[in-house]
Structures are given as C-alpha cells and as structure tokens.
Amino acid sequence: MVPLGGCGEIGMNLTMYGTAGKWLMVDCGMTFADDNLPGIDIVVPDPTFAETEAEDIVGLVITHGHEDHLGAVHHLWRRFRCPVYATPFAAELLISKLREAGIEDDVDLHIVRDERPLELGPFRVTLIGLTHSTLEMQALAIETPHGTLLHTGDWKFDVTPMLGPVSDEDALRAWGAKGVRALICDSTNIFSPGTSGSEGDVRAELIKTVQGRKGLVVITSFASNVARLESAAHAAKAAGRHFALVGRSLWKFYEAARKVGYLSDMAEPLNDKEAAAMPRDKVLLLCTGCQGEARGAMARIANDDHPQVRLKKGDVVIFSSKIIPGNDKTLYQLHNQLALNEIEVVTEKDRPIHVSGHPSRDELRRMYEIVQPEMLIPVHGEARHLIEQARFGVKDCGLPEAHVVLNGDILQLGPGTPKKLGEVPVGRLAVDASGLVLTAAEMLQNRRRLSQNGAAMIVLVVDEDSELIEDPRVSLIGIAEGADMRALIADAERAIERELGKVNGRRPADDDMLAQTAVRAVRKVVRQANGRRPVTECAVVRLEEGERVAAADKWKEAV
C-alpha cells in the first residue's frame, strides 16, 4: 500500500496497491488551496510515483463522485494513462471534467453498472454500496494472492438515507466471514462520539423549519448532496412554495443525477430568473456557497451582488451544512452581514438540519465488528485522526493491530508481518493557468511574497557611461497609500541617486550592478519605513548620446 494523498490530510485522496508487479490505483482527488497559495484554487497530488509505474497500473477505480476522490483525474490522467472505472453517477460527473480538459475520447472509461467483480491483473475488485453524503459510494473488496483488502472510501451507516440504498451490511459481513487482511478505513469523524445521524431526520427538520415562513426562504448546502437537494424540494412542496436552484454546481449535480435515473419523481426546479418572477413568499431557493465561497451564490446574494436574487428584512437563510475548519471567519462574516440586514440565519447549531456523511465512533466500532479485519489502516484524515483511529480500533475495540501510514509510505501488508519498506516521492501540485506547478515553486513563492510584502518597480535611464540622464522612477504596489506613498517614493528615489553616485564614483557600472544597487537602496528604505521586504525589480535602459525617452514609456518595453 502506497498512499500518495489523503493520509495526513483530509482531501486529495489517492492510494495505490501493488502486488505481483502490478498496481491498482484507488481514487484521484483534489483539495482546495489555502491563503499560502495566492492565485491558486485547486491542489492535486504529485503523481511522480504513479508516473514511474504507469506501464504496470492496471486501472484506477473511483469510489464516488466527490471532488476529493475524482477531482484530479482530468489534471493527472495524462501522467499514467490507465483505464478508469466508476459507477454511472461518478462517471457522469467525470465525463464533464474530461470533456473540459479535452481528453474525453482518450480516457478508457468503464462504467460499472452491476456487482460483477472487476478482473484487473492480479486484483479482483468487488464494489460494495455504502451510504455517504452523495450518490453511489462504493467500498472496494480487493482480492489479491496474499489476502483481501477492504477499502471503505467515505461512508456511514444510515437506515434512512432518503436517496439510494442503505449500506450493504450483508455484503460487508460476507467478506468478513471470508477473511479480511486489512480494513482501510475513513477517519474523518473519529473524534465524534455516537453516530453521524440520519438524512431522514434532516428532511423532516427542514420541512418543519420552512413551514410558516412569510418571506423568501433560502437554503444553502453542499451541492454534491443530492439527497439534501431532494429534501429541500420536499420542504418547498410541503410549504406550498416553488423550488428553484441557484448556482451552477447545483445544476451540475442535479442534471447528472437525473441523467442516471435519480430524482425522476421530482418536478423540474425553476432557475433564478424564473424564481425572481414569482411572489417572494411562494419561493424556496437552494443555493451554492454554504462555506461562504466568494464566487458562490450565497455570498453574492448576501452582498447584494446577485443579478436575480435580493434579500429583504424578514427573509430567512438556512445553512444546511457544517462549517468546515478554516472557513469559520469567512462564514461568520457572512452570517453577520445577513444579520445586519435583518435576515434570519438558521444553522445546524440552532436546529438539526445537517448530518455528516462520515462515520462517528459507534459506526466505526460496528464496522470493525462486522468485518473483523486482521489489521486496521486508518486513512482520510490528518495525522491526529489516523493516530486516534488506530488507538481506538486496538485499545477500545479489540482489533489485533493497526498501522498508521502517511503519504509516501510503502507499507507491506502481506505476506508475513506488516512492515514499512520505505518511502516514495510525494508532494502537491498547484493547478495554475500555466499548468501544474509544485507548490514549492519559485513562482508561487514570489506570489506569497507579493501578497505579504507588496512590490517595488524601478526604472533607471542611463547613458553609455552609466550616468543617470533622468531621475530614477520608482513605483510601489501594496506598500503604502496617499501622502505616505509619495514620501516613500521620494525617499527611495533619493536613495537610488545617492547609492549610484557611490558606485559610479569608483568605476563605470554594468547593468546588473546598477540594478542590484538600486534594488538594495529601495528595499532598505521600505524596510526602515514599515518593515516590509517588497519583491523588487529594476529595468535599466541605456540610451545613445542625445536620446531622451520617457522612462515610463520605456518601462513597458523593458518588461
């Protein structure tokens, strides 16, 4: 077992299993960039190891349609070019991504429509339907010459999932009876006691929460939760309201679900334009942006920046979601903005209108009892999640052993005693407009410096003897404003003249020496003024005798 993503972090899942000289890849997901990567939205696993083993990869099996499990396929597939296997719903989502990337016709995509095992080289893979917060989540029973692995993917036990079947406990029990060498198990909610709750209870609570409202009702939730979408539609119908979807990602998941046979009993939702023409007290909107994303519909609506939707005093916004760690500040700002506009805000803290799609401790214990694995391998979590599930499985639940693996570890699962064999290269790639770049690349380091310290640009116009024939020109970005900016620029330009005078007093300077001297002078002035160390660039323009060209114009040519 070699995890390339998802072990030591939540998101970006990619795991490889190897035996008999062949490799099976499970999932290929992305994660969202944080503030340390300015200008970057998406991060994917570094597939260097998979690329080196590309000829021996027998297939990529996708467990389900969440972005952290399939969102990197269209970015990375060219690196390993193996067949891809997915159920109809996940395949429908993936096809649109492959089409956008221009590789739809290149990828050998197999849509798995039944329970027949996949024969992939030395691996025999059987899909097991489990409940999750999106459709068609599949655990994988992976038979190998040295034992069977059960890779759970993301899952929970829910007797009323509302859309799709309940988790197939009979299949899990049957595999447990045959013998499971290792249970590779979701760790996301290891710190949550009890159970994760039922989608059926959320539906009932949403219906109650919407009843009796006078103004516009807005619900915001994760777009991929199709059962929650259907629950919002039921709440609208029960309250005598028209149901509308606002946000492209909601329409994407709705249309994918309809195309593969779900939501067939549900009336077509209105779009935002159609909803805007209806009486406000007769409409329920389901919107994207439950995490306060700047480009999500909810943030635009709250900021009165949406072309069709306007909130008024007395309306209500229902957040049928949890706050993902790291989004707290953004969401509280959104809540405050709504409150200031006298919009009622309802969250999961107020009413039970959200449940997780991942197992809490009682569900994990039940999974262990059903499967009875020889060993537990926690995945899908930060280090603290993995370590705690390993402890919980062995100390609290009596499993024989557990092993914590992090991205890049090579863990031998069999035959014989499990042991770490070494490590492979791992890392993160940022999805940039120019392509995939290492998150440690100089380009991104410069962006971070720009975002934190600002920038300074210098133009020097000199003659053949390196003497200034125009005053230095300095521009500062993101460093100061107004009078402070003008004073700082004046100080910087005087410092350049002073330092260049010292250099040319010794000997004629070349362009590099002039530029380095000017950069040092400006950085020193700025650092002394406000402690910043700006990204600083200098263009040196040499002119023939008698030539006079404005430095500002030449700057455009120089860069």
Language-model regions, residue ranges each:
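Conserved hydrophobic residues forming the short capping helix/wall of the S-adenosyl-L-methionine
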Residues: 98, 393, 526
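Short acidic-glycine loop/turn motifs at beta-strand connectors
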Residues: 18-21, 144-146, 237, 414-416, ...
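A glycine- and charged-residue-rich anion-binding loop/surface
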Residues: 7, 31-35, 41-45, 56-57, ...
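C-terminal tails and terminal domains of large nucleic-acid-associated
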Residues: 507-544
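Short, well-ordered strand-loop elements centered on a beta-strand within folded domains, enriched
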Residues: 1, 24-25, 151, 418-420, ...
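His/Asp/Glu-rich metal-coordinating catalytic cores
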Residues: 2-61, 66-278, 296-310, 329-333
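Short glycine-rich phosphate-binding loop at a beta-alpha junction
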Residues: 83, 377-378, 537-540
